[in-house]
Amino acid sequence: MSRLEQRFAQLKTEGRAALVTFITAGDPGYDTSLQVLKGLPAAGADVIELGMPFTDPMADGVAIQLATLRALDAGQTLQKTLQMVSEFRVDDQTTPIVLMGYYNPIHRFGVEAFVAQAKEAGVDGLIIVDLPPEHDAELATPAQASGIDFIRLTTPTTDDARLPRVLERSSGFVYYVSVAGVTGAGSATTEHVTEAIARLRRHTSLPISVGFGIRTPEQAAAIARLADGVVVGSAFVDKIATAESPEKAIDGVLTLCAALAEGVRNARIG
């Protein structure tokens, strides 16, 4: 059983959803980013998505685009992102880490080398936003063969004809993008999310995590009552962007994480 499977199974027995947190690797610099990464589990993160900086992040909103630029300007590379996971794993062998990003940097790195090094570093899953299931042979197949889950994105515009194809080779969990558009957009209504989750459950038994537009403990709690996971990204990135110092960036992210975790953990009580 993979770390992702173990974590979602554990949370199911506890009767609560997972808090899935996203940060961009290397934002605003390697050392600060690593400290944030290491601090997230104690602050309540159940699963961590780590963004792989890329020069053309087309699916991301302004906040994450700027985070990517900060990371690249600070010298972040795919090799350093894998190194960051390795350093995290020295002290934490249980929290799942999912790398999220685009295929181009992996293709340039070399798929075989990337999969081998990602596995060795302790990466548990991949979300590649611009690689559809028609291209499974390029990365999904070798990744899953090495024990790395391949997580698919579904959206409000993924129709019933397309959905089975998208979900067919998914593993780890399903990431439902609740608002069509770029990251950081407005949040969907609970009615919409309820209907979407019911539709997804007709096609998959995998845990379903919902993201895009979730910023507050109240919003996180509302989604945690419906989904298996709550994904928060832009809100953390904004904390880093507006911090006056690296120390305040770390504190801002971890304080927000603790508040969101409390919302998620208490969502189904009462």
Swiss-Prot record:
Pathway: Amino-acid biosynthesis; L-tryptophan biosynthesis; L-tryptophan from chorismate: step 5/5. Keywords: Amino-acid biosynthesis, Aromatic amino acid biosynthesis, Lyase, Tryptophan biosynthesis. Its EC number is 4.2.1.20. The active site is at E49, D60. GO terms for molecular function: tryptophan synthase activity. It comes from the Bacteria. InterPro entries: Aldolase_TIM (IPR013785), RibuloseP-bd_barrel (IPR011060), Trp_synthase_alpha_AS (IPR018204), Trp_synthase_suA (IPR002028). It holds the Pfam family Trp_syntA. Disulfide bonds: none annotated. It is an enzyme of class 4 (lyase). GO terms for cellular component: cytosol. It catalyses: (1S,2R)-1-C-(indol-3-yl)glycerol 3-phosphate + L-serine = D-glyceraldehyde 3-phosphate + L-tryptophan + H2O. Belongs to the TrpA family. The alpha subunit is responsible for the aldol cleavage of indoleglycerol phosphate to indole and glyceraldehyde 3-phosphate. Tetramer of two alpha and two beta chains. PANTHER family: TRYPTOPHAN SYNTHASE ALPHA CHAIN, CHLOROPLASTIC, TRYPTOPHAN SYNTHASE, ALPHA CHAIN. This is Tryptophan synthase alpha chain. It comes from Pseudomonas savastanoi pv. phaseolicola (strain 1448A / Race 6).
